Amino acid sequence: MEEGGRDKTPVQSQQPSATTPSGADEKSSGKERRDAGEKDKEQELSEEDKQLQDELEMLVERLGEKDTSLYRPALEELRRQIRSSTTSMTSVPKPLKFLRPHYGKLKEIYENMAPGENKCFAADIISVLAMTMSGERECLKYRLVGSQEELASWGHEYVRHLAGEVAKEWQELDDAEKAQREPLLTLVKEIVPYNMAHNAEHEACDLLMEIEQVDMLEKDIDENAYAKVCLYLTSCVNYVPEPENSALLRCALGVFRKFSRFPEALRLALMLNDMELVEDIFTSCKDVVVQKQMAFMLGRHGVFLELSEDVEEYEDLTEIMSNVQLNSNFLALARELDIMEPKVPDDIYKTHLENNRFGGSGSQVDSARMNLASSFVNGFVNAAFGQDKLLTDDGNKWLYKNKDHGMLSAAASLGMILLWDVDGGLTQIDKYLYSSEDYIKSGALLACGIVNSGVRNECDPALALLSDYVLHNSNTMRLGSIFGLGLAYAGSNREDVLTLLLPVMGDSKSSMEVAGVTALACGMIAVGSCNGDVTSTILQTIMEKSETELKDTYARWLPLGLGLNHLGKGEAIEAILAALEVVSEPFRSFANTLVDVCAYAGSGNVLKVQQLLHICSEHFDSKEKEEDKDKKEKKDKDKKEAPADMGAHQGVAVLGIALIAMGEEIGAEMALRTFGHLLRYGEPTLRRAVPLALALISVSNPRLNILDTLSKFSHDADPEVSYNSIFAMGMVGSGTNNARLAAMLRQLAQYHAKDPNNLFMVRLAQGLTHLGKGTLTLCPYHSDRQLMSQVAVAGLLTVLVSFLDVRNIILGKSHYVLYGLVAAMQPRMLVTFDEELRPLPVSVRVGQAVDVVGQAGKPKTITGFQTHTTPVLLAHGERAELATEEFLPVTPILEGFVILRKNPNYDL
């Protein structure tokens, strides 16, 4: 085809110049050609067509005559001709084509007719004809004055055309002109059921969205169409502004409830973040099996409902929602996959593959920094497996290979290994609580918090163990216990925990770091709840701090706590932004931007992204400042306080673009392109933040283009860009065991063998890549990427915002912040149970998810599938469906824990 096209073009361009030297000739030749064309056209008409054309012309003439008795039969005949013309999909039906030249004449005839049935008939015919004319909505105009007979008789194309005109007309009428909207509504009430019955559900939805009457859908939907309609509505949510998006979700939710599809309705209620509605859906369902399935969904999303004890199977439901069985189910999967054998960091580094000239990297093996890296790697790789080779056998030996804060993080990594195992885990950590070293004790406290992350326990062991240390004399002890509480109760909005923590911020003994961590912990506990006490306490703390204190790098956690408290709440932050106006620069811009981006997290709000791009394009005169900064840093390397940086909020803006756009794919693609520009042309502050933004937009989804970009910048001249790029590579591939990434990181480890900081980052990235031996994910989205877990986003943000000052926080003494990732860790598995919650292995097909929105029929939802037996792992962008007819899933999205029922129609 292409070649043909290529051959044609030169011929066309030569034609006029070869045949017609002057412009005048060209015109005349054009005219001749047209005349010839018309003659051909007449010859082209076959006998039948000629007969039809004459017949139609005769009918039109008959309507122009004086004899009114002939009108009726003439109109009847015209109507019959138009209707009976079987139309092909690509061309205009013949009668309409031949009647087109008579359109004006027919309108005149209509105007001159006496009112009555004939006039209405004529209006109907003109309305259908108007489809072929690009007129001023005449199709609709004549329909409204026509005979009002049913639409279906004129065919689908006519209905579609009419719907388009109704939508345009509606938008031009104001609310004042209600009377004129009535006839349009009547028409809509005819169009919608017609579309529903003829597989054009999405057209019905579009029309109702245009005229803002989505609620009308509910009564026209039948059992066969509801799934498609709701899929279409929920897919549109990303592309409509507030408050229409919630209206669409509520409409789809109403439809699901009408057909008693409780799990689907619950998912939408969670998208709306409306807890009363969630509770209402949960309690109004009377089927215990479905309730258990919903409890699994709530547990995965980190929502716990206080049920009344007289609910049937109260204990089971509470246990499922509390994620009590998460650990045992995860270990069952590990046994199934045969990966229980603990791994040591060297299995991950694969040092034997490095072709070092000096035979292994022997010289610097036992440095404290490398041991710290190994503690993290060991924790990440064996996360939730409950056993390892460094800490669970004889931990003291390993702990004392670390120094000071290194001991804190090393002890805390034990919590990660025992993740979710509250009963068994705490007994193993207990012995370290009696250590003589404050750092080890503090790490053990943090470990207690980590073990409880995402799991609720009646006895509240985390609160009981950690509460005594929150106001301890030693700030080190405070850090472990406060951050531990933040992780253990993230997303619970528990008042008793918050009342315990809030006073610490204002306590005179609290260092800036402790105040920051407290704000962070409170933000995580109250995530997305707009808790008034948290807001006022953090604001008060910010107001009370002096300008010098706010320049401390840990001050960044105060506004982050505020932002997390309002995560995804949109406009609810106006008052806070106003309150922050009194704070001095540069902290004010930093805090404002941070709170603002948190409020719109995952919303895909394009206008916000535009504002953030404006912030990124501001230019500060930073030449002198950069020089000062270098001198100052040489002078006081040990001093934590980095000089005030006017562009600090730009880094947050870059992260914010990723945070807002990560919710939907088109936005994420566009953000990706923007990041490319920023990396090439941005200021240093921007460039340091871009790798982190790339990590956030593609967590646990190792796309090659992103990995290549990060790999390029992992050799950047600015050390902070390279630190962040290397860590981002780990985030992008977290829990995937991606072989290509693992090879890249091994090469980097060789390249940076002499640079302890970069090597530390490479080790962290290697640990993350093999997170949970490849069974866990950090991606905050689940349920087919529809639901965003706020707790997971809070954990990721905590880490990424800290990485904006990687040198003083992560490579300084506060690497324990990396345990914020625990809040985002989730197994990426699919486990199936029978109605009694016994594991039920069935065969499932796992393949790449295909978007089937608005497609006719029942298209395949996955492609390139393989058949496995559950439990199975699901990678990013994969979807599973049952490969057997024997069972029916209680929820349509097979992810996490799914209950199956016997199919009553299955014949053995």
Swiss-Prot record:
Name of the gene: Psmd2
Polar residues: compositionally biased ranges: 10-22
Database matches in InterPro entries: 26S_Psome_Rpn1 (IPR016643), ARM-like (IPR011989), ARM-type_fold (IPR016024), Proteasome/cyclosome_rpt (IPR002015), RPN1_C (IPR041433), RPN1_N (IPR040892)
Keyword Acetylation: yes
Function: Component of the 26S proteasome, a multiprotein complex involved in the ATP-dependent degradation of ubiquitinated proteins. This complex plays a key role in the maintenance of protein homeostasis by removing misfolded or damaged proteins, which could impair cellular functions, and by removing proteins whose functions are no longer required. Therefore, the proteasome participates in numerous cellular processes, including cell cycle progression, apoptosis, or DNA damage repair. Binds to the intracellular domain of tumor necrosis factor type 1 receptor. The binding domain of TRAP1 and TRAP2 resides outside the death domain of TNFR1.
Complex and partners: Component of the 19S proteasome regulatory particle complex. The 26S proteasome consists of a 20S core particle (CP) and two 19S regulatory subunits (RP). The regulatory particle is made of a lid composed of 9 subunits, a base containing 6 ATPases and few additional components including PSMD2. Interacts with RPGRIP1L. Interacts with CRY1 in a KDM8-dependent manner.
Protein name: 26S proteasome non-ATPase regulatory subunit 2
Modified residues (Phosphoserine): S29, S147, S361, S363
